Curated annotation (Swiss-Prot):
Keyword Membrane on entry: yes
Transmembrane segments: 88-108, 131-151, 178-198, 206-226, 248-268, 278-298, 328-348, 371-391, 453-473, 478-498, 510-530, 531-551, 730-750
Gene: CLC-A
Subcellular location: Membrane
Limits of the CBS domain: 595-658, 703-768
Known role: Voltage-gated chloride channel that could play a role in the regulation of nitrate content.
GO molecular function annotations of the record: nitrate transmembrane transporter activity; voltage-gated chloride channel activity
Protein name stated in the entry: Chloride channel protein CLC-a
Disruption phenotype: Loss-of-function mutation clca-1 leads to an altered nitrate content and hypersensitivity to chlorate.
InterPro entries: CBS_dom, CBS_dom_sf, Cl-channel/antiporter, Cl-channel_core, Cl_channel_pln, ClC
Cross-referenced Gene3D superfamilies: CBS-domain (3.10.580.10), Clc chloride channel (1.10.3080.10)
Keyword Repeat: yes
Length: 775
């Protein structure tokens, strides 16, 4: 961090490029493992646009005496309440996500619609300079609102939010990411940014909004106005909140694309680390509720009760009426689309990585620089969208088409702009409209001559530039729609170039181009395939869409990481990948533990003074609890106790005058499982008198007696798979052979210890051939 608290982004290599060779690598006399420095890490990361202190979540079940008693004593009615509440909250997540998505679409379509109508009025009167001033002024005002809200009220609302959601579901606590203020700023900011014509989508923000709704419902509302309903005590834990947020993220994708199955698969393929069949059902239920809500509002809006909205804002690029015909010869252009998508997607990721580093340097200068950067991008975007159509030639209207040509309204495929009657400006049709309508226009079918090649090249080049410079400014933003716009442009260009040599409609080429670029950048296949099928409502596209997605992902993977992985790396979020690096098999957890400070342990019945000293002088979040040695059994590892539980003991002053074990009823009288699940306790709020320092605490009833342990000879690769698969926060390392007088636990590993980048800092010669992607 610098002096102003801004995070300095790491310069470590993110795509595994070769670095300079160390001359010691060729020396046979060097030891196999050369320890360079102590294993260490930073607990800071960017959450949205805010530098935050990062901790891990407790997804593991804490099997202490209280939990076991609570589990045994639950009645059938309580079990039914728990299950019923799970499904009720899943329904409410879908309901509120659908309602808020409709609100956002209504606002965006009406604000942008009236803005474009005003601009069209001045253009029709040949008052182009006035039209430009109105267009630019409105966009600057909307951008200013979105940016100021993010910069000054909720920095965590910046960006799409999907990388932070991935991190949360991976086990990383992202502070303030799902708060009420963040959600409200995300809603209003998304409306402002998208209505301002910025090259941003509302799809990523909707995923974040759905997750915020899920988190708020699970905890009973905002922190200051939380509902104290006793049923909600069942959800006062990280495991159930994780499941709810998974439902929320799937509902957000469904609300963005009206794709219920695609939303479920997106959550499974992209954001969720841990999955099971019961969660699949609830997630699908949430997305089904979203679709019902959206369908109901579409019926209402189609009757003209939503202003300029209609059904336009609820994205549906319907090409179901298009006859899909392709033959063996079409495999060549389809393959080219996939290859182009992979190459351009990886190139886009690489360039965006550089732009985000540059923006980080600008943002470090202060809040006003963040606002000015957003306004500068908005000004550039507005001038380009309004000015570039003057470069296009006017095209005569085709009398054989059924649509009105030319048009001067807010939508339509044939905008007149500066052309005489009977002619239209094809580039204006793509630029002077909302992003959703631009995609509909470029996806239009049975219109082989609607867009000229020059206009498509200008459109493609512009949105490549806008896609790079817009993402990263301090506004809520999504990547889906900008990538769709770029991909559909080069797809349509290829279809236009093929002309009569192909049987596939140019609009379908645009769909395939959009799919290929998304796969080349985001590296998703199954979920994207289903999303595009539900988006276009044409099942006949399935075979060639699958083919294009597989090629694009394969080509993209050969160059660099996916865009969300790159953003995770830039933000410094300690995300654990599913596949360990190959060199991790050459290192054992015992050797890794040797690079850490000695483990801090507590006795089963511990003195208050010792507990206070440990909490004051360490930042560890868990401590092994040992029972004293005797001649027959030696030292026993009783379990693991969390820092939060120690703080609760001190706050409640559950002290003993003598060193003894407590009875079961004594702990139940003082604590409940619900209290132990809360995470708000802070040691700084604890005040212990000098006389209390000499008292004792029995830690046995609050200790997790079944922590996960690994023997010190296990490879780091195997330990990483276990850590990630089970969703752990702490992993105890035990000796292979416990000698007399030796501690039964030799260390604790956390997610920071298992990150490839951190390991290579302590063991720089492990990765001799740079075979992995150190993060």
């Amino acid at each position: 961090m610098d002096e102003d608290g801004n995070l300095q982004i790491s310069n470590s290599n993110y795509n595994g490029e070769e670095e300079g060779e160390d001359p010691e690598n060729n020396t046979l006399n060097q030891p196999l493992l050369k320890r360079h420095r102590t294993l260490s890490s930073t607990p800071l990361a960017l959450v949205g646009a805010k530098v935050s202190h990062i901790e891990s979540l407790d997804y593991e079940i804490n099997e202490n005496d209280l939990f076991k008693h609570d589990w045994r004593s639950r009645s059938k009615a309580q079990v039914f309440q728990y299950i019923f509440l799970k499904w009720t909250l899943a329904c409410l997540v879908g309901l509120f996500t659908g309602l808020i998505a409709t609100l956002i679409n209504l606002a965006v379509e009406n604000i942008a619609g009236y803005k474009l109508l005003a601009v069209g009025y001045y253009i029709a009167q040949d008052r182009f300079w006035t039209g430009l001033m109105v267009f630019t002024g409105a966009n600057l005002g909307l951008t200013l609102v979105a940016t100021v809200l993010v910069v000054y009220f909720a920095p965590t609302a910046a960006g799409p939010g999907i990388p932070e959601i991935k991190a949360y579901l991976n086990g990383i606590d992202t502070p303030n990411m799902f708060g009420f203020t963040t959600m409200m700023v995300k809603i209003v900011g998304s409306i402002g940014a998208v209505a301002a014509g910025l090259d941003l989508g509302k799809e990523g923000p909707l995923v974040h909004i759905g997750s915020c709704i899920a988190s708020l419902l699970g905890q009973g509302g905002p922190d200051n106005h939380r509902i104290k309903w006793r049923w909600l005590r069942y959800f006062n834990n990280d495991r159930d909140r994780r499941d709810l947020i998974t439902c929320g993220s799937a509902s957000g994708v469904c609300a963005a694309f009206r794709s219920p199955v695609g939303g479920v698969l997106f959550a499974l393929e992209e954001v969720a680390t841990w999955w099971r069949s019961a969660l699949l059902w609830r997630t699908f239920f949430s997305t089904a509720v979203v679709v019902v809500v959206l369908r109901a509002f579409i019926e209402i809006c189609n009757s003209g009760k939503c202003g300029l909205f209609g059904s336009g804002g609820l994205i549906m690029f319907d090409v179901s009426h298009v006859e899909v015909r392709y033959h063996a010869a079409d495999i060549i252009p389809v393959t080219l689309i996939g290859v182009f998508g992979g190459i351009l997607g990886s190139l886009y990721n690489h360039l965006l990585h550089k732009v985000l580093r540059l923006y980080n340097l600008i943002n470090q200068k202060g809040k006003i620089h963040k606002v000015l950067l957003s306004l500068g991008v908005s000004l550039f975007t507005s001038v380009c969208l309004f000015g570039l159509p003057f470069l296009a030639e006017c095209k005569p209207c085709d009398p054989s088409i059924d649509e009105i040509c030319p048009t001067n309204g807010r939508s339509g495929n044939f905008k007149q702009f500066n052309c005489p009657n009977g002619y239209y400006n094809d580039l204006s049709t793509l630029l002077l409209t909302t992003n959703d309508d631009a995609v509909r226009n470029i996806f239009s079918s049975n219109t082989p001559n609607e867009f000229g090649m020059v206009s498509l090249w200008i459109f493609f080049g512009l949105y490549c530039i806008l896609g790079l410079i817009t993402f990263g400014i301090a506004t809520p933003s999504g990547l889906f729609l900008p990538i769709i716009l770029m991909g559909s442009a080069y797809g349509r260009m290829l279809g236009t170039a093929m002309g009569s040599y192909t049987n596939i409609d140019q609009g379908l080429y645009a769909v395939l181009g959009a799919a290929s670029l998304m796969a080349g950048s985001m590296r998703m296949t199954v979920s994207l395939c289903v999303i595009f099928l539900e988006l276009t409502n044409n099942l006949l596209l399935l075979p060639i869409t699958m083919f294009v997605l597989l090629i694009a992902k394969t080509v993209g993977d050969s160059f660099n990481l996916s865009i969300y992985e790159i953003i995770l790396h830039l933000k410094g979020l300690p995300f654990l990948e599913a596949n360990p690096e190959p060199w991790m098999r050459n290192l054992t957890v015992g050797e890794l533990n040797d690079a850490k400070p000695p483990v801090v342990t507590l006795n089963g019945v511990e003195k208050v003074a010792n507990i206070v000293d440990v909490l004051r002088n360490t930042t560890h979040n868990a401590f092994p609890v040992l029972d004293g040695a005797d001649q027959n059994t030696g030292t026993e590892l009783h379990g693991l106790i969390l820092r939060a539980h120690l703080v609760k003991v001190l706050k409640k002053r559950w002290f003993l005058n003598e060193k003894r074990r407590t009875e079961e009823w004594e702990v139940r009288e003082k604590f409940t499982p619900v209290e132990l699940a809360e995470r708000e306790d802070n040691f700084d709020d604890v005040a212990i008198t000098s006389s209390e320092m000499q008292l004792y605490v029995d830690l046995h009833p609050l200790t997790n007696t079944t922590p996960y342990t690994v023997v010190q000879s296990m490879s780091v690769a195997k330990a990483l798979v276990l850590f990630r698969s089970v969703g752990l926060r702490h992993l105890l390392v035990v000796p292979k052979i416990q000698a007399s007088g030796m501690s039964p636990v030799i260390g604790i590993l956390t997610r920071q210890d298992l990150r490839a980048y951190n390991i290579l800092q302590a063991f720089p010669h492990l990765d001799k051939h740079k075979s992995g992607k150190a993060r």
